[in-house]
């Protein structure tokens, strides 16, 4: 009789893993791989076994993907043996094969480069704490090159396991260069979708990367600071339970009252299908079009109004980057710029069905350095959320219809899911919607494309179609059409502190004499429609787009006033050069 070398449990002799501790049971040494000497011990890294499996006996699946992590770092974080994690990933890959996706593991803590194109064939690496996202991207580039060199099926899905301390989150320079913004960069996993080298960062910052074909559809399972291995096991089991599709029958939607018309508009397709609970018996103070309103429905009431069988959560509320502000908030009383918690992280534990979570809030998808209770997305993923979409930075949207920026990417993502696309495909569809007939991608639009990240397994789908005639079709892997005129030149007319002379006084001497009148008209509109007291714009810019069109951009800010939550509201007003207001965007 054989015994597990790790825990001593008796074995029958045929097991691949110990049923007690999860340790891999080796019955014979693994054969060498392409001239690379085997590890000089009884262990062989999981990525080598899976790569051999793919070349010799690939699963009969039409979809292929990579589970990407750093097992050594993950094992240290969880305080567990790496073999336990290898077993979890192997079981997950086996289970997901029945959903027509063949996942293989790429472990950055024990990886052998095997392609010619990556330039490091036979190099064995173990990425540590000092490794950057570029080092991790190089591993993905090796996978891409190997698949192309050997004619293997393309692994179009990339499922990242771990937070910034496990697989670094790339950051790019921010597109919006306004001093009042406060953010200098954007954290985005989008660079892992294009594993072609460090130049992809500058290509994304110039927005030209959107014209290139992406290789991976990326989703990430971040790991909270307070998590143990049960967090990972729980999510993987949840995802396996819905591998055939996440049932979506009941929607919970809540918004700040200033955005009620827009949110009700976005939710109207699901309202017509009866997916939003009928709240006709609730006063208009609390509800609009079956969408609950923030100031009246607060964290104290969530448990009594959020149904336990909710399977899609759509929130259009404010978020904060202050570490102590864990939940989402709303303005209360209206037009006072005072913000209070409306939707706490604990609310993510109310639904007892597997669910999809979508949030427009600023910093709604923050997770780096946060525990479960301080991160909304991690709180959901620790419970029943299997797919999530949220932003890493300040997000912008329209106060009222038509939709723009965060409203568009979130609403289109949901439509994509509910018309048969996988989560990763729905993310592509949502980003493609920004390249429309007007031929313009603004700095706000570019920010939205990068800052919204997908959470969870990107291969998962919803189990409902809004309209069978609109079932999922094959998508282009280019976010932007190759002939789309991307780019813009910005001339700052005035910016920053006003000094002794007011900004508007100095604007009077600007080349465009009508800017003073335009600014006055904007001030009246903001006060009449949104209660924003008259003030000077902090920034005025003239923007010339690659298609030849020109716009004026006025930026304003309104700090919170004595709020329990730290929320600075930003306004960005775009006009034609003759002063016609085209859009009014506000931060979420």
Language-model features and meaning:
Residues 165, 186-234, 316, 321-413:
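Catalytic cores of nucleophile-dependent amide-cleaving enzymes
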Residues 112, 165, 360-483:
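Active-site-proximal C-terminal subdomain of hydrolase catalytic domains
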Residues 110, 116, 143-168, 251-370:
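Catalytic-core segments of thiol-dependent peptidases
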Residues 1-35:
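Cys/His-rich metal-coordination motifs, chiefly Zn-binding "fingers/knuckles"
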């Amino acid at each position: 009789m054989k015994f597990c070398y790790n825990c001593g449990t008796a074995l029958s002799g045929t097991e691949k893993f110990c049923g007690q501790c999860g340790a891999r049971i080796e019955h014979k040494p693994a054969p060498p791989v392409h001239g690379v000497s085997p590890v000089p011990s009884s262990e062989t890294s999981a990525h080598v076994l899976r790569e051999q499996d793919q070349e010799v006996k690939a699963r009969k699946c039409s979809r292929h993907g990579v589970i990407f992590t750093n097992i050594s770092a993950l094992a240290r974080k969880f305080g567990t043996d790496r073999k336990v994690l290898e077993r979890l990933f192997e079981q997950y890959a086996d289970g997901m094969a029945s959903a027509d996706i063949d996942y293989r593991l790429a472990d950055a803590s024990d990886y052998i480069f095997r392609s010619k194109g990556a330039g490091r064939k036979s190099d064995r690496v173990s990425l540590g704490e000092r490794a950057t996202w570029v080092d991790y991207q190089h591993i993905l580039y090796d996978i891409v090159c190997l698949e192309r060199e050997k004619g293997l099926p393309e692994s179009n899905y990339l499922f990242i396991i771990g937070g910034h301390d496990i697989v670094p989150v790339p950051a790019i320079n921010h597109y919006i260069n306004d001093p009042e913004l406060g953010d200098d960069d954007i954290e985005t996993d989008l660079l892992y979708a294009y594993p072609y080298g460090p130049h992809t960062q500058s290509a994304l910052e110039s927005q030209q990367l959107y014209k290139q074909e992406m290789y991976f559809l990326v989703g990430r399972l971040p790991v909270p600071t307070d998590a143990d291995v049960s967090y990972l096991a729980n999510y993987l089991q949840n995802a396996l339970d819905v591998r055939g599709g996440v049932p979506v029958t009941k929607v919970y939607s809540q918004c700040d009252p200033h955005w009620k018309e827009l949110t009700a508009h976005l939710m109207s397709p699901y309202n017509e299908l009866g997916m939003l609970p009928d709240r006709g018996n609730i006063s208009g103070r609390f509800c609009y079009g079956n969408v609950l309103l923030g100031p009246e429905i607060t964290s104290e009431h969530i448990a009594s109004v959020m149904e336990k069988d909710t399977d899609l959560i759509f929130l259009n509320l404010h978020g904060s980057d202050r570490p102590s502000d864990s939940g989402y908030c709303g303005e209360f009383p209206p037009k006072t710029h005072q913000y209070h918690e409306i939707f706490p992280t604990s609310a993510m534990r109310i639904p007892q069905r597997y669910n999809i979570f979508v949030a427009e809030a600023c910093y709604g998808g923050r997770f780096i350095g946060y525990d479960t209770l301080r991160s909304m997305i991690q709180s959901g993923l620790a419970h029943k959320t299997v797919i999530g979409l949220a932003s890493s930075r300040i997000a912008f949207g329209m106060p009222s219809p038509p939709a723009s920026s965060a409203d568009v990417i979130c609403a289109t993502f949901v439509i994509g899911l509910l018309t048969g696309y996988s989560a990763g495909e729905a993310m592509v569809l949502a980003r493609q919607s920004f390249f429309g007939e007007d031929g313009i991608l603004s700095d706000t639009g570019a920010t939205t494309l990068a800052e919204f990240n997908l959470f969870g397994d990107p291969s998962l789908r919803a189990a409902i179609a809004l309209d069978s005639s609109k079932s999922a079709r094959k998508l282009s892997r280019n976010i932007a059409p190759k002939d789309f005129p991307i780019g813009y030149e910005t001339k700052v007319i005035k910016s920053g502190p006003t000094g002794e002379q007011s900004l508007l006084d100095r604007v009077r001497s600007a080349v465009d004499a009508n800017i003073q009148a335009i600014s006055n008209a904007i001030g009246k509109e903001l006060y009449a429609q949104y209660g924003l007291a008259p003030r000077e714009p902090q920034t005025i810019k003239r923007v010339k787009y690659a298609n030849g069109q020109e716009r004026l951009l006025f930026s304003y800010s309104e700090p919170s006033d004595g709020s329990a939550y730290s929320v600075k509201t930003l306004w960005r007003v775009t006009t034609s050069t003759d002063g016609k207001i085209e859009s009014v965007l506000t931060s979420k």
